């Protein structure tokens, strides 16, 4: 007995320990249920209201304290404000922690309430209760509720996912266990058909009682809409609001309302994209999401593991995005690819001839040629077929071992003859000297596609004896040349990758002249996703469809970091145990295996292994024919669109009726999968298309042996194979599963070791024979584990890079949210002024450069130095910073007070005379370079005597500078991430270099952003316009009446003013006291529709608004 087995016997295995922990809750639920089921329907609903109130009463003291602190913060100095806001943050965290305590306390009663609600719906056609306002609202849009006088009548049937359903489910004990596990913030692994969707109702209901919102996350929009409609009535019966974000357009009022519901359903991508959109919003009313409280992720493995390798990105056009070289260099690359194909085909022919010889030396030469052909074109079908012959693969692997020895010292002898080298495992392509020569054969410059040694060239330039101006010009030319060549090399590399590593109908499909990515895990099209770094454009060029313009990142986050923001995260799936380590490492999520309600009766058979793919597919077809004759339904799982179409053609030739589900045919997915359990039905599904929909069997089918699962290839992940098996044998139904494998399969080619190859040879494996061998099955599993480790490495690597971005993102998004909401904007602005003061002192005090300090101070803060030269040289940096900040703060306050003082008379006049007509007013404020039209609430601006204008101005400037700086920073971070990969050639860790360099980039970005913000704020004033002509007045009225956005303004309309404060103040006061009509005040905004950017410009030019007067908005 091993140590692990001994410990399991002593303490029980993990699963037993987990269930022991949950059992007391289940016992309490049963006790509570006995009392709850005796209540009337109205009393049952009343219990929910009592529980909701109990939660709010538990945290009312903390909420009152927060309200009190928010009132106190006004008028406090910077240090006191920071202290108060820190207390507010701490109290908000305490509220969440206290709520968890009270939720655990009321869990048995809440679970009993929802279980009994399910029972009442299952056992009664209608439930009659006293009508509330919510019931009346529900009756307007939902047919399962009707109002009869003061009574609300709930039906037990409704439409979900386009189908009429009759409620017939009541929670089992194992589902109560699952619900408790989910409430505790863990992952519940439940077998297919065990009712995961129903399990979720328990923790969703409980946590929704807090009013903080619960997010139920699904893998596709069909499931999110279906589940919200299917489970929604249970929640609505108790007065909870339910909505689904996928039913509404992004940034719409309807979507905002969906997030404000107690329970919100949606897809992982849309939740993530809404978060990014919120962090690009320019007004609080544009925000849709609330704080991230509690999320339950359905098919958690698919969302947190499979989708986690692709970050969510919102991108936009980049300058010169149309100037791309993919189509220009496509003929060069096609020429190289074609030459490689011919070479590798000839190498294979020569290798076969030599290896057939009796001479050992000839055989060795043949083995070398075979290995060379493999390095050049590993996916060549003839090569794959030849490698499955006895002794061939093991011979090639021995050759590989010999040339990889001594750190691949002799590998060049293999690869020099090739044009490029493909490494499938690393997903990389590398041009050889021979390939570069062929590429450049069409050009005059033999180094056309070769990057110059820029460091050596710049070093040589520094040593030249010439004047500084000439050296600078030469340096600029070297850098420009490097930039041009770098883009060429990158374009060619991406085109080569597109040809060598990406295959149509496997990783992507072409539909409607567009290249669409296929999710390798589910076989679904990934709408809106594009390969990054120019790879998508390269594939578009290869497929001769329109090459889309290059884009740049505006906002990005990985799903890992998005879901880690939730206060509490839980998930459910049928298959998570194999990835339990990763789920704990990254998300700190524990996996708990929930026992099945009935024992599993499915028969899982050993893999059947064939030599070639052709034999394997022939055997699959024979098996399908046999099973159909027995009257059993068959679900055939494939790994690509190509294979599903091949099997479909083979079945058509045999006259077998069947349905195909793949990325090209996904519209009727749920409908086809639901029908897949009927007698003699054959369904071919790419990977796990149709996941989330139950396959129900008739009594006749169960008698015949149940649903038969046939896997046509082992997937790279054992988890996906388990998902396919799990489609059969739900709720104790009979069924079977079997996988057909060939030595030509992708997994076997890449990861099957020499041991497998030699074992096959020893077993005397002949063509047409089938093997069912435990040793081989274990070898396949070991190969899968290898790939899983590899994929985990990729995801962890992605996360490590994104963690760097995440810490920066948190700083920027927090500052941005403070500006947007306005509550902490005053404190943030003062902090920014202080940071600029500190940076100025740090930059000049150490070098004792007082003159430089004075000049930079005027540029940054637009004030004279309050510090003399003697004080500058005699005091410590901290004291100097405080002195400078005091003066800067006073100057800033004076300027803001002056703006309020000048603006208020105009605001007051408009409010007094036209408050019934206008709701908002535009106030122009300039920094001397551009004019910002600041939109404010008219009443608020008058009541605060112009102070609210200052707050809106600060918000507008901070948001503008953050967005401009962050967008540019993301572009630089993208470039940095690409450039640091070369560090590995110098035996340095690219991630470490990335961390160091990105910190420096971020520090500089924040410093520049602070300076820009402060420079605008410290120069702010209300401009004094020249009296406009009547035509200009009318023209301006048309535009400005509708727009409160910031805009660039033609400064020729404004007088050139010196920075003489007294003259400036006088001019502004004169402008404020000028009689009405002498210079028209800024026109307020009416409550009417805005001009869309694509609408005709109101000036009458005939151009679109965005191309005319809206160009600079």
Swiss-Prot record:
Q: Which reaction does it catalyse?
A: ATP + H2O + cellular proteinSide 1 = ADP + phosphate + cellular proteinSide 2
Cofactor(s) named in the record: Zn(2+)
Q: Keywords on this record? A: ATP-binding, Cell inner membrane, Cell membrane, Cytoplasm, Membrane, Metal-binding, Nucleotide-binding, Protein transport, Translocase, Translocation, Transport, Zinc
Domain of life where this protein originates = Bacteria
Q: Where does Zn(2+) bind?
A: 1097, 1099, 1108-1109
What is the membrane topology listed in the Swiss-Prot or TrEMBL record? Peripheral membrane protein
Q: Where is the composition biased (Basic residues)?
A: 1103-1113
Enzyme Commission number, as recorded? 7.4.2.8
Query: Which terms in the Gene Ontology molecular function aspect does this entry carry?
Result: ATP binding; metal ion binding; protein-exporting ATPase activity
PROSITE patterns from the UniProt entry = SECA, SECA_MOTOR_DEAD
Record note on cofactor: May bind 1 zinc ion per subunit.
Where found, per UniProt?
Answer: Cell inner membrane; Cytoplasm
Which GO terms of type biological process are on file?
Answer: intracellular protein transmembrane transport; protein import; protein targeting; protein transport by the Sec complex
Bias-annotated ranges (Basic and acidic residues): 1042-1072
Chain segments carrying region Disordered: 1042-1113
Q: Name one GO cellular component term.
A: cell envelope Sec protein transport complex
**Broad enzyme group:** translocase
The role this protein plays is: Part of the Sec protein translocase complex. Interacts with the SecYEG preprotein conducting channel. Has a central role in coupling the hydrolysis of ATP to the transfer of proteins into and across the cell membrane, serving as an ATP-driven molecular motor driving the stepwise translocation of polypeptide chains across the membrane.
Subunit notes for this chain? Monomer and homodimer. Part of the essential Sec protein translocation apparatus which comprises SecA, SecYEG and auxiliary proteins SecDF. Other proteins may also be involved.
Member of which family? Belongs to the SecA family.
Protein's name according to its UniProt entry: Protein translocase subunit SecA
Q: Which species is the source of this protein? A: Porphyromonas gingivalis (strain ATCC 33277 / DSM 20709 / CIP 103683 / JCM 12257 / NCTC 11834 / 2561)
High-level lineage: Bacteria, Pseudomonadati, Bacteroidota, Bacteroidia, Bacteroidales
This protein's gene is called secA
């Amino acid at each position: 007995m091993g140590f692990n087995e001994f410990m399991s016997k002593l303490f029980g295995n993990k699963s037993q320990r987990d269930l022991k922990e949950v059992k007391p809750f289940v016992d309490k639920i049963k006790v509570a249920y006995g009392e709850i089921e005796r209540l009337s329907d109205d009393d049952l609903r009343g219990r929910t209201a009592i529980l909701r109130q109990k939660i709010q009463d538990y945290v009312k003291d903390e909420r009152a304290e927060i309200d009190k602190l928010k009132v106190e913060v006004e008028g406090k100095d910077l240090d006191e404000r920071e202290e108060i806001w820190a207390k507010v943050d701490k109290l908000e965290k305490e509220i969440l922690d206290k709520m968890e305590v009270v939720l655990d306390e009321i869990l048995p009663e809440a679970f009993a309430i929802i279980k009994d609600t399910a029972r009442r719906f299952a056992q009664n056609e209608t439930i009659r209760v006293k009508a509330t306002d919510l019931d009346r609202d529900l009756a307007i849009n939902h047919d399962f509720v009707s109002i009869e006088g003061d009574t609300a009548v709930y039906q037990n049937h409704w439409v979900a996912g386009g189908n009429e359903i009759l409620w017939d489910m009541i929670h089992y004990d194992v589902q109560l266990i699952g619900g408790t596990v989910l409430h505790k913030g863990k992952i519940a692994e439940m077998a297919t058909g065990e009712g995961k969707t129903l399990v979720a109702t328990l923790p969703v209901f409980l946590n929704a009682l807090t009013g903080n919102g619960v997010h139920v996350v699904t893998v596709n929009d069909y499931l999110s809409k279906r589940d919200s409609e299917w489970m929604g009535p249970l929640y609505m019966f108790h007065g909870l609001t339910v909505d689904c974000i996928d039913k509404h357009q992004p940034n719409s009022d309807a979507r905002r309302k969906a997030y404000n519901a107690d329970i919100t359903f949606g897809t992982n991508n849309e939740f993530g994209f809404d978060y990014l959109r919120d962090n690009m919003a320019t007004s609080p009313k544009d925000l849709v999401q609330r704080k991230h409280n509690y999320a339950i992720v359905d098919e958690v493995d698919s969302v947190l593991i499979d989708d986690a390798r692709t970050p969510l990105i919102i991108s936009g056009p980049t300058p010169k995005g149309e100037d791309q070289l993919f189509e220009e260099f496509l003929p060069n690359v096609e020429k190289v690819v074609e030459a490689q194909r011919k070479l590798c085909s000839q190498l294979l022919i020569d290798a076969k001839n030599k290896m057939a010889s009796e001479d050992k030396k000839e055989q060795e030469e043949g083995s070398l040629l075979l290995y060379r052909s493999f390095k050049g074109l590993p996916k060549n079908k003839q090569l794959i077929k030849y490698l499955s012959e006895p002794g061939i693969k093991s011979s090639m692997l021995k050759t590989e071992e010999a040339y990889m020895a001594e750190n691949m010292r002799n590998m060049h002898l293999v690869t020099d003859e090739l044009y490029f080298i493909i490494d499938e495992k690393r997903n990389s392509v590398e041009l050889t000297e021979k390939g570069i020569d062929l590429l450049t054969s069409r050009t005059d410059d033999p180094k056309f596609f070769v990057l110059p040694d820029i460091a050596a060239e710049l070093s040589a330039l520094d040593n030249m004896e010439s004047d500084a101006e000439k050296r600078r010009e030469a340096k600029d030319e070297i850098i420009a040349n490097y930039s041009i060549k770098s883009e060429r090399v990158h374009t060619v590399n991406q085109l080569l990758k597109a040809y060598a590593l990406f295959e149509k109908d496997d990783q992507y499909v072409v539909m409607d002249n567009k290249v669409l990515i296929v999710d390798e895990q589910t076989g679904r099209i990934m709408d809106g996703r594009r390969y990054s770094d120019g790879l998508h454009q390269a594939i578009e060029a290869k497929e001769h469809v329109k090459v889309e313009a290059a884009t740049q990142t505006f906002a990005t986050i990985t799903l890992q970091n998005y879901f880690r923001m939730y206060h509490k995260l839980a998930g459910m799936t049928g298959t998570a145990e194999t990835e339990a380590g990763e789920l704990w490492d990254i998300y700190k999520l524990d996996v708990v295996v929930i026992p099945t309600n009935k024992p599993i009766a499915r028969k899982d058979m050993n893999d059947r292994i064939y030599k070639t793919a052709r034999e394997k597919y022939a055997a699959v077809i024979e098996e399908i024919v046999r099973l159909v004759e027995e009257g059993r339904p068959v679900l055939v799982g494939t790994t690509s669109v190509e294979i599903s179409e091949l099997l479909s053609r083979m079945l058509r030739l045999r006259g077998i009726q069947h349905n195909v589900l793949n990325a090209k045919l996904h519209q009727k997915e749920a409908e086809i999968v639901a029908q897949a359990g009927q007698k003699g039905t054959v369904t071919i599904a790419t990977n796990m298309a149709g996941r989330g929909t139950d396959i129900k069997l008739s009594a006749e089918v169960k008698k015949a042996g149940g649903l038969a699962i046939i896997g046509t290839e082992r997937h790279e992940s054992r988890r996906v194979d388990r998902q396919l098996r799990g489609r059969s044998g739900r709720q104790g139904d009979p069924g079977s599963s079997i996988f057909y494998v060939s030595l030509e399969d992708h997994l076997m080619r890449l990861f099957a070791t020499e041991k497998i190859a030699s074992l096959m040879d020893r077993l005397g494996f002949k063509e047409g024979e089938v093997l069912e061998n435990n040793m081989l099955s274990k070898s396949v599993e070991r190969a899968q584990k290898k790939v899983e480790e590899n994929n985990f490495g990729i995801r962890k690597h992605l996360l490590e890079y994104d963690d760097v971005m995440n810490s920066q993102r948190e700083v920027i998004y927090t500052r941005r949210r403070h500006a947007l909401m306005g509550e902490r904007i005053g404190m943030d602005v003062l902090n920014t002024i202080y940071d600029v003061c500190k940076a100025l002192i740090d930059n000049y005090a150490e070098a004792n450069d007082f003159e430089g300090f004075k000049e930079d101070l005027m540029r940054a803060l637009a004030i004279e130095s309050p510090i003399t030269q003697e004080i500058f040289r005699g005091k410590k940096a901290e004291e100097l910073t405080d002195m400078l900040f005091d003066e800067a703060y006073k100057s800033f306050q004076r300027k803001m007070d002056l703006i309020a003082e000048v603006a208020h008379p105009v605001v007051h006049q408009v409010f007094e005379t036209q408050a019934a007509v206008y709701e908002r007013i535009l106030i122009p404020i300039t920094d001397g370079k551009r004019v910002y039209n600041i939109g404010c609430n008219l009443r608020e601006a008058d009541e605060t005597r112009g102070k609210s204008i200052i707050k809106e101005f600060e918000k507008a400037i901070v948001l503008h500078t953050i967005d401009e700086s962050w967008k540019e920073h993301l572009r630089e971070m993208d470039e940095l991430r690409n450039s640091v990969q070369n560090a590995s050639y110098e035996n340095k860790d690219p991630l470490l270099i990335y961390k160091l360099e990105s910190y420096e980039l971020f520090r500089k970005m924040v410093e520049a952003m602070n300076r820009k913000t402060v420079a605008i704020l410290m120069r702010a004033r209300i401009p004094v316009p020249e009296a406009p002509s009547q035509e200009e007045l009318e023209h301006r009225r048309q535009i400005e009446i509708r727009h409160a956005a910031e805009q660039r303004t033609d400064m020729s309309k404004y007088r050139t003013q010196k920075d003489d404060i007294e003259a400036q103040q006088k001019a502004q006061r004169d402008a404020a006291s000028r009689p009405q009509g002498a210079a028209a005040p800024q026109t307020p905004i009416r409550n009417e529709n805005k001009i869309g950017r694509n609408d005709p410009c109101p000036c009458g030019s005939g151009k679109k608004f965005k191309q005319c007067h809206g160009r600079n908005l």
